[in-house]
Amino acid sequence: MDSALYHSAGIFGAPSASTGGSMIASSKPLAFSIERIMARTPEPKSIPFPNLFQAPVGKAEPKQSPAPLHCMIPLMPLACEPPHKLHINGLDHPDTFAYNANELLSIGLNYKNEQQDAAPAIGQYKLFRPRVVNQSSFHAMGAAVCYLNCGEGACPPHAGLVNLHPMASYLLNTPLHARQKSLFSSEKSKQGAVADRCPPGVSFKELSHSHLHHYMKESAHILSEKLFKNSAAKVNSGSPQTKPKVFTCEVCGKVFNAHYNLTRHMPVHTGARPFVCKVCGKGFRQASTLCRHKIIHTQEKPHKCNQCGKAFNRSSTLNTHTRIHAGYKPFICEFCGKGFHQKGNYKNHKLTHSGEKQFKCNICNKAFHQVYNLTFHMHTHNDKKPFTCPTCGKGFCRNFDLKKHIRKLHDISPGPHSPPTPTGNTEGQ
């Protein structure tokens, strides 16, 4: 994994006779520069990664030797000359390949001379690939530059290696997009990258060649996997969405998303109607239904039918009434095919097919399908009859019975000021 880039001697001068073709010493080493490359573009762009496993065209590796590892990304240059470091004559080394400067620029790599600000001349650069794993440094232009395998033990933090990401360290000081930079600075990403690949305290020299090759292959794709899994990353990185709480009725199995709705539903099975109208004695399960019901005992009917002129106290009642003129009966009984304008009437009719009459009178044992029918029946056992005929003064428990009485006996159609029709068959459901 240890490699470096350096200038060919042909660019900076021919090798001297005293050195015998070795690299020419220089007062300062060449520095790695990303800022110059990034400054040429108006907007920061992500830097493409080099192909770490494909040898240059025309340069085949010997079949008998193991496949060498590319490490084209130099880390932070350090001035260190430990005696165990291997000094390599890069010009004569068999594992060097010539690269054109344009090819290096295309992958985002560039060298600049610290003594001058000018861009390097277009020429030939040398890419050194280590023959063995422990070839971790070499003398470039007379100064020791440590790269990936700096030291005998595990790679030290001062070498600029970001969490054993050999391709990530040089990106931290570049004007990358914030999302790209966060992929390298995230602590979770760092911990996950090292967990299974490089045990702590293990030297790179102790790792097998195949292990390093496998690690480099995974590291090369670590960024692309994170960048292009946008949707999956947002889903997986966020906290798991908890399912909404549900409340199930133990009697009928109906499911509600709030406990309040379940509480409102339970009187359907118990038959309790604690909210009673003081005018007609009709009971309701909810206080809001009772408030709407009280309107029928007033003379306020702002909603009128355009076809027959009949007035209603609520717009919903008018909408239901218009179905009569249109002949629209959306609620069809699946047993007999009879249609109904209102859903409440449809439900009441279905009970006639089942024969079930669970609401019984405690006095006469008469049974009813609906609890509101039992409520009206109870008026027959007392003297309370809220609906009175204006002509003869006869009282009725229900407004429906009063209207029938007026039409049959007095031959008068109910006018706008006649007692309004209760809507208990729909409101109490």
Swiss-Prot record:
Gene: fezf1
Localization terms from the record: Nucleus
Alphabetical UniProt keywords: Developmental protein, Differentiation, DNA-binding, Metal-binding, Neurogenesis, Nucleus, Repeat, Repressor, Transcription, Transcription regulation, Zinc, Zinc-finger
Region (Disordered): 409-429
Keyword Metal-binding: yes
PANTHER family with a match to the protein in the record: FEZ FAMILY ZINC FINGER PROTEIN 2 (PTHR16515:SF35), PR DOMAIN ZINC FINGER PROTEIN (PTHR16515)
Source organism: Danio rerio
Similarity-based family: Belongs to the krueppel C2H2-type zinc-finger protein family.
Task performed by this protein: Transcription repressor. Involved in the development of the forebrain region.
GO CC term (a single one): nucleus
Intervals of motif Engrailed homology 1 repressor: 29-44
GO biological process, one term: cell differentiation
Start-end of C2H2-type zinc fingers: 247-269, 275-297, 303-325, 331-353, 359-381, 387-410
Record protein name field: Fez family zinc finger protein 1
A GO molecular-function annotation: zinc ion binding
Cytoplasm found in the keyword field: no
Principal subcellular localisation of the protein: nucleus
